[in-house]
Each structure stands twice: as C-alpha cells, then as structure tokens.
C-alpha cells in the first residue's frame, strides 16, 4: 500500500514551471491536458478525455438592403437536449451582431469580450468600429489560444460606412468575408434552401422569409437543431429583431 501511494504521489504535475502571470506561456503537457475538448475537425486526443457534441444551425447572408441573420435555439449535451431557449445571437453594439455555434461558453465569452473592445475603440476613435475591424479583432484574440480546446464558429454581421458586412470567424483564427454563411450541424440543410432562393435584389420581407424557412428545414432534418427560429435584420440604422417563432408552429406554413 505504501508503495502504491508513493507511485501516486510521484505522478508528473500538469506543469513543472511555477505559477505564471496572466498571458505568459504555460506548459500544459501533463495529464490534465487529456481533458481538453478537441477542436472542430481535429483528431481525438490520446487517452481518456471529454467527448462533447455541439449541434446548432445559424445562418446569415447579405442582400441589397442589409444583412439577414437567423438562428435556432436548441442546445445539446451529447445526445440529450439541454435547452430549447438559448439566445444564439450576441448583440455586440447597435450595428453589430455575432452568432453562436460550437461551445456556448466559448462563443458567449469571446463575443462579449469583443463587445467591450468595440466600445473601447469607439471611445478612443470617436466613431463606431467597422465590421471588418471587429471581425479581425476577434480572430486575433482567439488565434492566441489555437489548439487549446476552444470550440467556436461565429459570424460577425453588421452595417458600417461601407455598407453591409459579413465575416466568418472560428476558434482556429480563420476569418473569411462572404455573401452567405451557414454554420452548425444543420448547415448543409440550410445551404440547400439558401442556394435555391437567395438573390442580391431580394426585398426585405422576402429575405426574412427565406432565412426563416432555411432554419426551419434544418431544424426539421437535424436532430441537434430546433426550438425556435429567431430572425434579425441589420440595416443602415442598425439591427432589429424581427421575429421569433416556434419550429412546431411553422410546420404547417412551410408544408412540412
């Protein structure tokens, strides 16, 4: 028994280095690193670890009158539904929105931190931050933690002096401008609807209806998406929350 206890005591610590100040590089190569959540698309870590499944459907696209953003509201923990009422749009400032896909805590923390940094920028420069600058700021912040288990796929949507803006940013530091994105486990179903109905010259009501229908079809086919469909419109005067409908209530209207 004594030898067994000694063997346990001699287990290598998570870090041989003394406590480091915030922001300093740390060696996390010890056993606790086995509990890290693997990044999207990454290989499983060797040995026992946490296996977390993330499911959602979020989308955004640009058109002549701004940007339309639509999300579902279901959160899952593995194969179980954890919540049907998650708010997956982060209201960064009156002209900027961010979406959540991946780990809810990661998305919420980094986008709220982005909101604070955007406010600091506005106070220093006496003008609102552009969509491009806000997305670059987020990408730079999360890139410092690449490979450390963050799980985030977000869209930064807004309107600035250049017009509508839309960027995809993920936890690997990827930053891509685009006309339309769908992110999450139901994204392939949403893309099918968007690609068949999206046009640059759409009327606002038509664009809102298309986004709502795309999320509904994704929620219908993807077990990890559901709850309610919430739609936002971002225009020259900022964003507005247009509607929130329960998925079950939309079933008859879209010929389910």
From Swiss-Prot:
Keyword terms of this UniProt record: Cytoplasm, Hydrolase, Nucleus, Protease, Proteasome, Threonine protease, Zymogen
InterPro entries on file: Ntn_hydrolases_N, Pept_T1A_subB, Proteasome_bsu_CS, Proteasome_sua/b, Proteasome_suB-type
Gene name in the database record: PSMB5
A cellular-component GO term for this protein: nucleus
Domain of life: Eukaryota
A Gene Ontology biological process term: proteasome-mediated ubiquitin-dependent protein catabolic process
Name recorded for this polypeptide: Proteasome subunit beta type-5
Coiled-coil ranges (or none): none
Annotated catalysed reactions: Cleavage of peptide bonds with very broad specificity
Organism this protein belongs to: Gallus gallus
Keyword Hydrolase: yes
Primary subcellular site in the record, as a coarse category: cytoplasm
Subunit and interaction comment: The 26S proteasome consists of a 20S proteasome core and two 19S regulatory subunits. The 20S proteasome core is a barrel-shaped complex made of 28 subunits that are arranged in four stacked rings. The two outer rings are each formed by seven alpha subunits, and the two inner rings are formed by seven beta subunits. The proteolytic activity is exerted by three beta-subunits PSMB5, PSMB6 and PSMB7. Directly interacts with POMP. Interacts with ABCB1 and TAP1.
This enzyme's EC code(s): 3.4.25.1
Top-rank EC class of the record's enzyme: hydrolase
Gene Ontology MF terms in the entry: endopeptidase activity; threonine-type endopeptidase activity
Xref: CDD domains: proteasome_beta_type_5
Catalytic residues in the record: 56
SUPFAM superfamilies in the cross-refs: N-terminal nucleophile aminohydrolases (Ntn hydrolases)
UniProt subcellular location: Cytoplasm; Nucleus
Family statement: Belongs to the peptidase T1B family.
Residue ranges annotated as propeptide in the record: 1-55
